[in-house]
């Protein structure tokens, strides 16, 4: 990549190489010139690590309305109904899109798509590729992207900021995204990417927490960049903690799929008690927020480090057939899941809030789209239901593709854009400053803004985050950009969003549980942050 010019012109630039970004890229006409920016390797995206599957109404005993109802219940009724309908109705077209591109899903004995069940779903409606669905989808779509002659892939290219007309001084015009500044990590050079259409499909922000199931790329880049560009964000207080992350010193980010509980696994305490029956009549199949809170409660009550997930009452053949990846990986760690229970703890897993978008994935800024975990469509409400997230990626990726085609003009004139200027900065003198701030931020978020919150904890968190942000901002202004500095700058901004939204919500709903306000409020409101000064307000759901 060292011979690249520093300025690149494309029709569409997509930040992110997971399911959301690749579904958009592969749905656009083949004569569009498209860039895909991957922050790491192409498959290093949350999609790759998704074990569960894609929720879709395919069985004749199931219905669109049942899937809508299940989603609304899981989301504590804070979901935007139009978004839920659009997503659920897009289930079959999304599955057809994946099949068309060659994704091989698990079939049943009749050679039909095998459907499993996960927490919150009243029916079997999860299509999957054994217990490694994300890997099957990711590797297939990546291969199709590599085969497409109109797609140019840039690996290890990290977006820094969005270029808009207003940032360039064209205040009299309606604001519009026209490009990005991007760091080529290998050559330590900042490039300018220009395009009339830019899509942020770069995942969530759960690296804000000390313990997470997410890959290292999940630093909230898209959410932070969009906010700095002038886009509203919403519902950042709702962060999902997956109930069952493996507790093992050699595998800190290893997720134990929800499908294991869907297929009958029990959660147990050290004395063998199946404790979920005390918390919810659905037991292990209760929504994730309820299960995660129950585990957190028992860990704190008993002073233990983890609970146990037990599927040993199923036959070895059943376990190896349904969970081949898990069986093999855990065996390598000395755990035979046909005989041994699995030590599990909750871990930060999914960002339910994000950049506010419409049905076409369009943000507040013309030409700028946000798709997947980066976005707030309103689908998830106060809690995401299992396997709705991959579905959302494809539904809104295809929707964004349609919108771009309708607005596409080949003679679109981009203004003159200055190259990145780092003449006034120097190389960082001590990277230990970044490392220290990174660790302090993630510990603060885990201890004060975790599964159970209080007003005092949130106030303490905000105080520390504001101090860290000042320090990081000074560092960013004084020194040459690096991957770690870009990520830390984004993560501290998104962490502040999470805390400010959490402080605004005076109730316990879904994933936001506070001891100071344990009851539900009557009105259903979403929390919206408006840039640049964190103007925060709550407005009724199903309104703009």
From Swiss-Prot:
Protein origin, superkingdom: Bacteria
Amino acids binding FAD: 17-20, 39, 46-53, 221, 373, 389-390
Family to which this protein belongs: Belongs to the FAD-dependent oxidoreductase 2 family. NadB subfamily.
Cysteines joined through disulfide linkages: none
Changes seen on gene knockout: Knockout mutant can grow only in a minimal medium supplemented with niacin (nicotinamide or nicotinic acid).
Pathway this chain belongs to: Cofactor biosynthesis; NAD(+) biosynthesis; iminoaspartate from L-aspartate (oxidase route): step 1/1
Chain coiled-coil ranges: none
GO BP, sorted A to Z: 'de novo' NAD biosynthetic process from L-aspartate
Cofactor binding mode and count: Binds 1 FAD per subunit.
Cofactor(s) needed for function: FAD
Name of the coding gene: nadB
EC number(s) stated in the UniProt entry for this protein: 1.4.3.16
Major location category of this protein: cytoplasm
Role: Catalyzes the oxidation of L-aspartate to iminoaspartate, the first step in the de novo biosynthesis of NAD(+).
Residues annotated as catalytic: 288
InterPro entries to which the protein is assigned, alphabetical: FAD-dep_OxRdtase_2_FAD-bd, FAD/NAD-bd_sf, Fum_R/Succ_DH_flav-like_C_sf, Fum_Rdtase/Succ_DH_flav-like_C, NadB, Succ_DH/fumarate_Rdtase_cat_sf
Any single Pfam family the record assigns to this protein: Succ_DH_flav_C
Enzyme type, top EC level: oxidoreductase
Catalytic activities: L-aspartate + O2 = iminosuccinate + H2O2
Molecular function via GO: L-aspartate oxidase activity; nucleotide binding
Protein name: L-aspartate oxidase
Site (Important in orienting the L-aspartate substrate): 118
Keywords for this protein: Cytoplasm, FAD, Flavoprotein, Nucleotide-binding, Oxidoreductase, Pyridine nucleotide biosynthesis
Subcellular location: Cytoplasm
């Amino acid at each position: 990549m060292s011979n690249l010019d520093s300025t690149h012109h494309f029709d569409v630039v997509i930040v992110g190489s997971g399911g959301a970004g690749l579904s958009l890229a592969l749905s656009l006409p083949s004569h569009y010139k498209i860039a895909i920016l991957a922050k790491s390797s192409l498959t290093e995206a949350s999609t790759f690590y998704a074990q569960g599957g894609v929720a879709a109404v395919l069985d004749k005993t199931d219905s669109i309305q049942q899937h809508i109802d299940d989603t609304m219940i899981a989301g504590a009724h804070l979901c935007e109904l139009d978004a839920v309908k659009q997503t659920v109705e897009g289930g079959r077209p999304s599955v057809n899109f994946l099949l068309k591109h060659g994704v091989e899903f698990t079939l049943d004995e009749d050679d039909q798509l095998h459907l499993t069940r996960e927490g919150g779903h009243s029916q079997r409606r999860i299509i999957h590729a054994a217990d490694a669905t994300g890997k099957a989808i990711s590797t297939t779509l990546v291969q199709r992207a590599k085969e497409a002659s109109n797609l140019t892939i840039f690996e290890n290219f990290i977006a820094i900021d969005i270029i808009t007309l207003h940032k360039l001084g064209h205040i009299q015009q309606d604001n519009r995204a026209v490009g990005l500044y991007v760091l080529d990590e290998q050559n330590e050079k900042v490039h300018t990417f220009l395009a009339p259409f830019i899509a942020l499909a770069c995942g969530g922000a759960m690296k804000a927490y000390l313990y997470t199931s997410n890959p290292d790329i999940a630093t909230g880049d898209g959410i932070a960049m969009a906010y700095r560009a002038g886009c509203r964000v919403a519902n950042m207080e709702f962060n999902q903690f997956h109930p069952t992350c493996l507790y093992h010193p050699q595998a800190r980010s290893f997720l134990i799929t929800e499908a294991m509980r869907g297929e009958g696994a029990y959660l147990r305490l050290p004395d063998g008690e199946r404790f979920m029956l005390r918390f919810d009549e659905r037991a292990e199949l209760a929504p994730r927020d309820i299960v995660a809170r129950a585990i957190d409660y028992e860990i704190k009550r008993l002073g233990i480090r983890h609970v146990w997930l037990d599927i040993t009452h199923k036959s070895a053949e059943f376990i190896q057939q349904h969970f081949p990846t898990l069986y093999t990986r855990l065996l390598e760690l000395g755990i035979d899941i046909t005989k041994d229970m699995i030590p599990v703890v909750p871990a930060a897993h999914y960002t339910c809030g994000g950049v506010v978008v419409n049905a076409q994935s369009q943000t507040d800024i013309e030409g700028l789209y946000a798709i997947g975990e980066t976005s707030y469509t309103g689908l998830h409400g106060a809690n995401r239901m299992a396997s709705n997230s991959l579905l959302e990626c494809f539904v809104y990726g295809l929707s964004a593709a349609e919108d771009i085609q309708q607005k596409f003009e080949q003679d679109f004139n981009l203004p003159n854009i200055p190259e990145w200027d780092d003449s006034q900065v120097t190389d960082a003198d001590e990277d230990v400053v970044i490392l220290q701030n990174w660790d302090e931020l993630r510990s603060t978020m885990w201890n004060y803004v975790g599964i159970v919150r209080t007003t005092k904890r949130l106030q303490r968190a905000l105080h520390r985050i504001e101090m860290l942000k000042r320090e990081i901002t000074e560092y960013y202004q004084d020194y040459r950009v690096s991957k770690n500095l870009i990520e830390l700058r984004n993560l501290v901004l998104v962490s502040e969003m999470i805390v400010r939204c959490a402080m605004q919500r005076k109730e316990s709903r879904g994933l936001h549980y506070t001891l100071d306000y344990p009851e539900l409020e009557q009105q259903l409101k979403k929390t919206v942050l408006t840039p640049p000064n964190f103007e925060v307000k709550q407005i009724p759901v199903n309104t703009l």
